[in-house]
Each structure stands twice: as structure tokens, then as C-alpha cells.
Amino acid sequence: MHAATGRPKIALRLPTEVMRLQRMGASFQTRISFARRLIRRMHRENWRIERLRFDLNDDGYGTALYVVTTPEHCYSLICFSHYLRPELRTDRVIAEAWDATFSLFDGIPNAADISRLAEQTPKQEAGRFQASELVLSRANKSLRIFDCVVDSLAKGTQPDPYNMSAVGYLMRTTAVYANGKFGMADRTRYTDQSALASPFQAEMLTVYLIRGFTHDLVEHLAACRDPDRAAILDRPVKRHLGIGNATGLGMAPFLISHPQLIHNWFHARETGLAKIRSIEVVTPDRQAKFRTLLARAELHIAEWSVGNDRQTARTLTLLEELQLLTKWTANGSEIFHEPVPWDALYRRAASAFSIEGQELLVSLLFEPYPGIIDDLGEALQVDCEEPFDPSLTVTEMRALVQDHYSWALAIDFTDSRESQYFWYYSEEKIEPRRGARRDEPGVEKEMKIAVAQDVQAFHVALGKTCGDETMTAFLMRSAEHRHVARRVQIGARYSYAEIQDNVISDSCKPIDILRGKLAFFGASKFDPKSDLWTRITMYQGAPLNDELDADDADDWCFPFLPMIEPCTSP
């Protein structure tokens, strides 16, 4: 087919391939990532962002207010910038103070609202909030770049491009809370507002606005230091400065705890890939667009500098694979004479590339086809919970387990390495944590995310029960299996609902789960700091607050260092 708008003739990649930690840990952003979808909506609906208040002193401490006007509603980001003693600065969840804290407010706050939030927002988890607050966040300055940028601007010059590119952001968030936490509005209160109806749009809006605040903050500090000489950031430089994020175990269980939602995410992406691979004629303009993006991606990957040896080695491999892609897709290449060219390219890459190279190709293939890909993002949310069918018999349920959870049944839990860890919820930090099962206390608080282990126990219990017995009778007697019985029914209906790996084994790297989720957010330049946490960049290259009406507002993926003249700004 010339335009892959119907059912793709190329099959979707199997869940047994896609839903493995190794592949999830090699994910990249795509056109259906949440940040990309937000920017497109902001552009399409002509959103307006105004800075209504910027009461910061010469040291950059005080309050700022940004108001976003959509066709239907207004939202406000209230920013509180604080002095932070150096010894208190940490990205870890144990922190109790930050360089800046933020609240996303439903509407435009009055003086009383701002006064109340000035008291509560800096407390973060210890604060108390109302339904008028949608998102709570905080951020710290990047010690490698923040002061350097201020120093350069104060002297009337642009920041050093290589120092800037090594980091890619001025500040990084260390938490973004929403969905009813600490008294804030539950997501169901604002899903009728089209601007925030899709998953994580309130959080993505908050992070985007924080990025703009960081730009304004460094320019303000430079102007305070030397009003006569201070420069402002050149637009290409400002666009290249995204917002960082430090993410740990807190978000990892989400992918396991929301099987139906996760199916929707991965199924949408895999449907998009199958549609692109099914295209029979790749027109010259689409070929040219792909080559342009490929060249951009090579520059972007070359600037992906991290301290993690494993990721550095993978990045070097990626650069070699991108050079091969460039050769394979050169103008006049025989690949475009294949019956289904993109499928031929993907199959060639699948046999020759690393998993990370394959997943980067998936991201690249999406870009020339907004008409095919972008609407798939409408299927990312869950509109209603899947009902549980208690009338199934034990025999029928055993068949579901064997048909859809063979990966779980294949794990040998007599090997102690397969149950090395347990996950639990820390009441002190209101965050998930991971402990060594045989060395640390708290196993009795284990979260129900050890899907493979639970499925095996469920399967054994079913095998000891009369096959004609219904789930109603079975679960009345064995209530400890209720959660997994429901899960198996969901997994049988939704093929991408499960991470098909053992998340409590000694080989599980939680950062693979994190990257799988963060790629759907729109993150780039993953910078693993251990197996348990990573830093990322969001919105690098994205249009600025006053550029959302640009014709190419969505053409910002794979950003690379802009050319910066080493001269003073006028």
C-alpha cells in the first residue's frame, strides 16, 4: 500500500520480543511520546504563555508566575526560587530542600493562593495541597553549567557551546508529583479538560514551563550582575537548553502496576512501526526527510556524552550503525526498490544492529509520516477498566496462564538468584524501594509486582483444584490470588500488558524499566548513574514559549549543538 492508513500487512513485532527489559532499556522517544504530543497540541490550538510575575531579587530568589491560556482554560505555574545551602543539594529522594519548587495551578491564582502555596510548595511531600493544584515539582541547578552560563551572559557573551552541550540543561527536576498526591487534584477531576485529558499532559506541561523559567532565571541573574553588559541567550542556544530530570526507582513499578495502560502505549507504537514497514512506495520527499533526520540523529548521538562505561560503549556502536544506515539509504539506494522498502531496511537492521540501533531506527522511521503516526497517540489512555470474569473455570484459567504466561512459567524460582530482590513501598519517603531479600528487613511489605512469581504460585494452586470450579469459588477460598487472577485475564486480552522478564532477579536492572517509560515521556540523552537511577533531558531543541506558532513547531527531535559565534551579543 502507498499510504499505510489501514490494517498493516506487515505483522506487529511480538510481545515476546518487544516486552523484554533489554529492549525496553534501549528505547527512544517517538512522535507519539507525551512531550511531542503536547507541543503539537500547543501549536495546533495556539496556546499562549505569559509571564505575569517575576519578583526575584538580585540573587535570583523569589516568586514567578507563568500563565498558559488554551482555547478552553487557563493554567498557571507558580515558581518559588530559594537559597539552598550547598551541603543540602542532592537529587536523591531524601532531600528536604531544593533550588526551586513549583506548583501547577488550575486557573489563575489570587494573592491568597500564592501566599498559601509559598508556604506549602517548598515543603514538597510534607506540604498540604488542594484540588486547585494539579502538579507539584522541584528542581536543582546543574553545578556543571548554571553558574558558567550566568557568568558568560553577565560578560555579554554566549555560553561555551561544548560545556553547554555536555549537560544540555540549566536545572533538573528531581520529582514531578500529580494525580491526587498530598491533597492535589485527582486526575479524574481534569480529564474532561481536553488539554490535559491524555496521559501525563499536566506533568509534561509543568516540565515545559519549568524549562522556560530556567532560561529567564539565568538571564535575570546576568542582568543583575552587570546591567550594562549582560546579554540574553541567543534563540538557538536557548532552544538547545532543555530541562533535566533525575529519576530513580519511584516510577519503575508504574509499568507493572498498569498493564492495560502499558499495552495501549506499546501497542500504539508497534502498530505505527507495522504501518510504516507496510508502505510499498517511499516517495523521494520521504526519502529526503529520512536522510535529513538520519544526519541530525548522528550529530545528536555524537553529543550524547555520559560517564557510564556501558552506555558509552553502546553509543559508539550506535554511531557505527548510523553510518551503515546512511550508506544503505543513500539517494538511489537499491533498498527503495524493494517491494516494501522500510520493511527491508528494518529487517536488515534487525539482523545486523544492536538492539539500541534497532530501536533508534524505529524512532527515525516514524518521523517522515505524521499523517500515519500522530493519531495513534489518541489510543494511549485507558477509558475504562477491564471487568473481571468470575465465571471462568479453573481449567479455563489454567489454559490462559499456559497460553499467555509461558514466559513466567519458564523461570526457575528454585534458583535463589531469581528471587534476589523484593520491592516495597517506603511510608517514610512515599516512594517504592528495592531490598535484598535475604539481607534486608521488610519482605513482609513486598509490593505485588513480582508477576512471574505470583503467576507460578497461582498456576500451582489452580493445578490442585477441581477443573470445573469457577473463579468465584476458587477466590473465595484463596483470596491471596485475586490480584493475579485479574491480571491474567487482562494479559490474555492485551498482548503487550506485561514486562516479560523477572523483575526480582539478580539480573534485573531497574533503569531498563525507567528508560522504557521515560522514552514514552519524550526523554533523551539517558545518563545512567547506576542500575537504580538515571538522568535524562527533556525538551532539548523544543520551541520556546513564544515560538509555539512556528510552522515547524514539531520538528525538534534529535537536537544537536547550534553554531554559536564567539562574539559578544549587542
Could you say what each language-model-derived stretch is?
Residues 24-51:
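Amphipathic alpha-helical segments
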Residues 73-83, 108-120, 434, 552:
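Short amphipathic beta-strand/extended segments with alternating polar/hydrophobic composition
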Residues 2-20, 97-172, 202-388, 405, ...:
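Mixed-charge, Lys/Arg-enriched low-complexity segments
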Residues 43-96, 393-425, 430-431, 472-474, ...:
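Amphipathic, interaction-prone secondary-structure segments
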Residues 558-562:
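Secretion-targeting segments and adjacent low-complexity export tracts
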Residues 64, 563-570:
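Secondary-structure-rich domain cores
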